[in-house]
A protein has these predicted regions:
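Helix-loop-helix hairpin linking two adjacent transmembrane segments in secondary transporters
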Residues: 1-37, 41, 63, 68-71, ...
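Helix-to-loop junctions at the C-terminal end of transmembrane segments
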Residues: 10, 110-123, 212-213
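A membrane-interface helix-boundary motif in multi-pass transporters
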Residues: 11-24, 209-228
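Helix-loop junctions on the cytosolic side of multi-pass membrane transporters
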Residues: 25, 30-48, 237-248
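Pair of pore-lining "gating" transmembrane helices in MFS-fold secondary transporters
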Residues: 57-77, 157-161
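C-terminal transmembrane helical hairpin of 12-TM major facilitator-type secondary transporters
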Residues: 124-170
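Intracellular juxtamembrane helix-capping segments at the cytosolic ends
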Residues: 165-181
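A late C-terminal transmembrane helix in Major Facilitator Superfamily
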Residues: 177-216
Length: 249
């Protein structure tokens, strides 16, 4: 909800106020952390540089990072350009901001639901959540082609619901793998997964930019869907490898 809220503040006042708002929220977070975070938390040990080698020579962990990058990043091929997509459907700039705020609420709901799903079987849950995300991206693409504002609005909110539903599962899966294969490097593996999230954002946004330059912004959702599909293939591959290993044992 932060991005659309910042956009709304900037449009209603001045763009400088968005940064003041961000700084204010950061200050509140800093003060809250100082008073609310326990002072007696255990201090983690130093990161072992050799852990990098252990992590990146572990096939399941490497694939988990790729799943994170593609599964999370595909959304941004469309989300980065959601405003012009909505404007092309006839929504005003003010209406787009309101839609994005509601989109943010849908993201929060999706995150919560995704966390519950991921608690059981992360890999199976990721396949379902990625599939729903792909369907929402395809639906958005079709509604834009149809130039149907009502369906486009529905598709955008569906995208918000499914876009980041996978985040808890992606992080949980990496932690589970780290506990299994490199228990001494769990913190480092988690950090690399966060890096994979950001790489995914970069790749997805750049893909959307290239598509917009060479084709049209209309096609960004379908290309985002293809990126997420790559993540699904990786998940299916890893799941098959795990099943074969379990059968062998």
């Amino acid at each position: 909800t932060g991005v659309p809220l910042g956009t709304f503040i900037g449009q209603q006042t001045a763009w400088h106020m968005s940064f003041l708002f961000i700084a204010s929220i950061g200050l509140v977070g800093l003060i809250a952390s100082y008073f609310l975070v326990p002072k007696n938390l255990p201090i983690p040990g130093k990161v072992d540089i050799k852990g990098i080698t252990r992590i990146f020579t572990n096939k399941p962990l490497v694939f988990s990072f790729l799943i994170t990058a593609f599964g999370y990043g595909g959304t941004f091929a469309a989300y980065t350009y959601l405003s012009p997509l909505l404007e092309n459907l006839g929504f005003s700039a003010n209406a787009v901001v309101i839609i994005l705020v509601v989109y943010g609420v849908m993201v929060a709901i999706g995150n919560t639901v995704g966390g519950h799903w991921a608690n059981k079987k992360p890999l199976d849950s990721l396949v379902k959540m990625f599939s729903l995300l792909i369907l929402s991206l395809v639906f958005l693409f079709i509604t834009v082609l149809m130039d149907n504002s009502l369906l486009g609005l529905l598709a955008s909110l569906m995208l918000g619901l499914f876009a980041f539903m996978n985040v808890p599962g992606l992080q949980l899966y990496v932690v589970e793998l780290a506990e299994k294969y490199v228990p001494e490097d769990i913190t480092l593996a988690s950090a690399f997964n966060i890096a994979a999230f950001n790489i995914g954002i970069t790749v997805g946004s750049m893909t959307g930019g290239v598509v917009t330059d060479h084709l049209s912004v209309t096609y960004t959702p379908i290309f985002g869907g293809f990126i997420v599909l790559i993540a699904v293939l990786f998940v299916l591959y890893i799941r098959k490898q795990e099943e074969q290993k379990n059968n062998y044992l």
